[in-house]
Regions:
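Walker A/P-loop NTP-binding active-site region of P-loop NTPases
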Residues: 4-69, 116
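Solvent-exposed alpha-helical segments within well-ordered globular domains of core cellular machineries
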Residues: 25, 58-62, 72, 100-107, ...
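Helical mechanochemical/support elements of P-loop NTPase systems and associated helical scaffolds
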Residues: 42, 56, 66, 70, ...
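Conserved catalytic-core segment of NTP-binding enzymes
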Residues: 104, 110-112, 116, 121-205, ...
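NTP-binding/hydrolysis catalytic cores, primarily Walker-type P-loop NTPases
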Residues: 212-239
Length: 239
């Protein structure tokens, strides 16, 4: 059974791409066959977070336009058996792809026998969002415990429901317990109360994420990382 999971946020800079990479790696480490799809056309980043930027030959738009076969564009991550990346086009804009084409692409990936297709959704609610959610079976919404990020997440949850995707899982990213205790940061309960969705996981603010991301090695692979442990738990809950 194949499943397409879109990772979205509304607000940029909350850790959506990092979350996508960690979920994808986490699933692959559990023995699953996974494709990470970067749907942020014109602003691709997932390849850098995964440390695969030097191996790109073809991209998502090349596949859709028939310049290459899907199999040619998929980059196998040699560190994790069963993990592949389909990068976004860097020199095109989001209008190069339609929701129908994205839906067909997801089906074609499913037909190749992949168990999970993780789509890294661009920030915002325009064409890129519509494309990313078109083929999705369910959604993960990433937010940080800030008023502006939570408000944007609320808007995204409404738009997901309008697109037929209900009950998204919520990830609260970069939580600092010391700030919550001082009353300087929203608690997980505060966020949950506002958004009224199930919390899939809480990722603590952890400098390991910055270090591992810069190395192109997602935190989920780090045994002693607090964020890595959180991502491993999130992965198990998603399965």
């Amino acid at each position: 059974m194949s499943e397409v999971i879109v990772v979205t946020s509304g607000k940029g800079g909350v850790g959506k791409t990092t979350t996508s990479a960690n979920i994808g790696c986490g699933l692959a480490l559990e023995g699953k066959k996974v494709v990470l799809v970067d749907s942020d056309i014109g602003l691709r980043n997932l390849d850098v977070v995964m440390g695969l930027e030097n191996r790109i030959v073809y991209d998502l738009v090349d596949v859709i336009e028939g310049t290459c076969r899907l199999k040619q564009a998929l980059i196998k991550d040699k560190r994790y058996p069963g993990l592949f990346l389909l990068p976004a086009a860097q020199t095109r804009d989001k209008n190069a792809v339609s929701p129908e084409q994205m839906k067909k692409l997801c089906q074609n990936i499913k037909d190749m026998g992949f168990e999970y297709i993780i789509i890294d959704c661009p920030a915002g609610i325009e064409q890129g969002f519509k494309n990313a959610v078109a083929g999705a079976d369910r959604a993960v919404v990433v937010t940080t415990p800030e008023v502006s990020a939570v408000r944007d997440a609320d808007r995204i949850i409404g738009l997901l429901e309008a697109n037929g995707i209900s009950n998204p899982g919520l990830i609260v990213n970069r939580l600092r317990v010391d700030m919550v205790k001082r009353g300087d940061m929203m608690s997980v309960d505060d966020v949950k109360e506002i958004l009224s969705v199930d919390v899939l996981g809480v990722v603590p603010d952890d400098e390991d994420v910055v270090i591992t991301t810069n190395k192109g090695e997602p935190a989920v692979t780090e045994e002693n990382s607090r964020a890595g442990r959180a991502y491993r738990n999130i992965t198990l809950r998603l399965m």
